[in-house]
């Protein structure tokens, strides 16, 4: 009987940890009240890199990653993600916001040629570990974050 209880306890811990593997706590401060405030008061006026991937694929990869690993994972509040794809402009925008609507981040994905994408991440000044977050978003745009990019890139 005792082994049965131990097995059930271990099984429950395993299930709970596997269900929450991707849902790490997302920092909800600092934040800014509007998109314009965020862009005007962002780390380095936006962190930017070029990636060797089509912008549509990068956008879809980020959309998947944000949906799996950013949305609803705040320390004390919910985090909401939103996105907008503008194919006529060959660009996509992804946002993370607090439950009250304040902006946590803005990510731009823009085509700069065949299979070339400019990724720009806007984080509020004072955001801790901005470079680490930027590298993680670049990895996610490439579809290389196994925790958050469940499907393989197109």
Q: What do the predicted segments below correspond to?
A:
Residues 1-24:
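Sec-dependent bacterial lipoprotein signal peptides
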Residues 18-39:
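Bacterial Sec signal peptide processing site at the extreme N-terminus
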Residues 36-46, 115-122:
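Acidic/histidine-rich, surface-exposed loop or edge segments in extracytoplasmic proteins
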Residues 72-114, 122:
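Surface-exposed short loop/turn segments
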